Amino acid sequence: MELEFLGTGAGSPSKSRNVSAVALKLLDEIKKIWLFDVGEGTQHQILNTTIRPRKIDKIFITHMHGDHIFGLPGFLSSRSFQGGEKMGPLTIYGPKGISDFVNISLKVSQTKLSYELNFVELEEEGLLLENDRFKVYAYKLDHRIECWGYRIEEKDYPGELQVEKLREAKAPSGPIYGRLKAGEVVTLEDGRTIDGKDFIGKAKKGRIVTILGDTRQTPNLKLLAKDADVLVHESTFGKGEGKLARNYHHSTCVQAATLAKEVGVKQLLLTHISARYVGKMVKVLEKEAKKVFPNTKVVKDFDTFNIPFPERKDDEQ
Amino acid sequence: MELEFLGTGAGSPSKSRNVSAVALKLLDEIKKIWLFDVGEGTQHQILNTTIRPRKIDKIFITHMHGDHIFGLPGFLSSRSFQGGEKMGPLTIYGPKGISDFVNISLKVSQTKLSYELNFVELEEEGLLLENDRFKVYAYKLDHRIECWGYRIEEKDYPGELQVEKLREAKAPSGPIYGRLKAGEVVTLEDGRTIDGKDFIGKAKKGRIVTILGDTRQTPNLKLLAKDADVLVHESTFGKGEGKLARNYHHSTCVQAATLAKEVGVKQLLLTHISARYVGKMVKVLEKEAKKVFPNTKVVKDFDTFNIPFPERKDDEQ
């Protein structure tokens, strides 16, 4: 998995930072891409990446502020104009009202999409979706308007079948390998029984990525961020601006770092950077956060991060 | 007056052309700026110009296709965020539905503007607005959906008072200059009467700028473009693609040039260039049009054109 930031600014675009959007690339066998927020100009940013809009099959919206949603109608329309193979469906997850906004925008512009568009408007906190490879959880944050954070849990990869060890045990190769890999107990032709579980290597833990919308500090953040391999957290304000952050329903870099430290996050990526922070001041934001949580980075537009598999203690595997 | 193109592409943004927007800068004493269409990313383009959003007090929308309106909510919101002196009101002229689109976008995003926003939805063709300096006319074009073209007529500048000639006539300077300039007949202290009209130089003709939305060729184009000093015309297709242009409710470069020639246009600016036209092919578009109407240019994003005063025959002045 890889994260690519398409917009890392707050409120309005600036010359150096577009408004919010981040792509989560599910590499490996799935090759789909999920977008989190679609500020105005996200489709323009995508033109400068290797992301192909047809690969984006899910969009998660944190909240309805313009700098997080105004790029949605244009992105959806342009995705429709792309030729070639049949365009797959796309599902948008977001707060109540997101389907109205998109549908009205498409209707007034008389845009007929070439693909199926589905909406899931969030109501209850907890497990939002589950498929073969992922579970996605959504919990409410504390912002000026309804706002959600997302926790993407990759499922564990099952261990590999240890073929060499099976050969040593003189188990015949063939269809029984599939049953052994599934963990079954198999009776061989010579009467011996062997247990698949004894021939499967260690499972590889899946990764956890937490992507938050704009928020004050609130207990749900701990639920969302616990043990995350990567936490994407807003940092609209700097150290010493806690009061401002609270008044404007945002967070400081130090609050984000404190959360990361408290709940065992591996890497903290700070985004939603105010236009007031430029040049050296961005380094100061990062430095202040690093004092609390060393593995912190203030991201820029187009920054890309590979998400490594977590190292776990043996007894957990 | 000056035209600055902020987006010159068709349908979707490309790396080299953004979707539609053009700014008409009313220099001289007014110093206001009028925008024609606001495709997604127009506010981003403005960041790379000297245009200050607060100076934009009128927006004219040609039609409701997404590549002409999806930048409107973001532009309006960001204009609101700008600090400093009190922000003046802004009026949007456009087809029926434009106020719904904007109001719903602002409502769902809970955006409260810091300035007064007014709408004028077009119904009848003809004179749309008149002030001290300008008349703006709107006529319907022939596109897939309701679409309008705008003709901006600058009023003539009255001639200057010929102070030297007054001195020669030994007319005393002072408050009577104002009355003479207004064309009054004034009785001097020495009993002579002098006619202001004899001491006013030639009037300067105002300029005519015609900015069209997407369109097939249709008789209203002639009404809109007659004697225009500058005609901004779409050129989605090239020579020999007349049938395609007709089917998709667009024009070819040669159709635009033919119109310009027929109705006495001074300069033709071709925009709304398809992403199919890049590099040398753009030059070909321009060359084909120039064969019919030599003073033609295919515009690029950020191209800026000063609009010169027309030279008129003496008897017209």
Swiss-Prot record, chains A, B:
Specify whether Ribosomal protein is a keyword of the entry: no
* GO MF entries: 3'-tRNA processing endoribonuclease activity; zinc ion binding
- Catalytic residues? D67 (proton acceptor)
Q: Which residues bind Zn(2+) 1?
A: H63, H65, H143, D214
> Which EC class, in a word?
hydrolase
Give the CDD domains listed for this entry: RNaseZ_ZiPD-like_MBL-fold (cd07717)
Q: Which residues bind Zn(2+) 2?
A: D67, H68, D214, H272
Supply the Pfam families for this chain: Lactamase_B
Q: Does the keyword Cytoplasm apply?
A: no
> What keywords appear on the UniProt entry?
Endonuclease, Hydrolase, Metal-binding, Nuclease, tRNA processing, Zinc
What does the note accompanying the cofactor annotation read? Binds 2 Zn(2+) ions.
What does the record give as cofactor?
Zn(2+)
- Origin, by domain of life? Bacteria
EC number(s) reported in the record: 3.1.26.11
Q: Enumerate the catalysed reactions.
A: Endonucleolytic cleavage of RNA, removing extra 3' nucleotides from tRNA precursor, generating 3' termini of tRNAs. A 3'-hydroxy group is left at the tRNA terminus and a 5'-phosphoryl group is left at the trailer molecule
Q: Which family does it belong to?
A: Belongs to the RNase Z family.
> Can you state the subunit structure given in the record?
Homodimer.
Q: What does this protein do?
A: Zinc phosphodiesterase, which displays some tRNA 3'-processing endonuclease activity. Probably involved in tRNA maturation, by removing a 3'-trailer from precursor tRNA.
Name by which UniProt lists this protein: Ribonuclease Z
Give the source species.
Answer: Ligilactobacillus salivarius (strain UCC118)
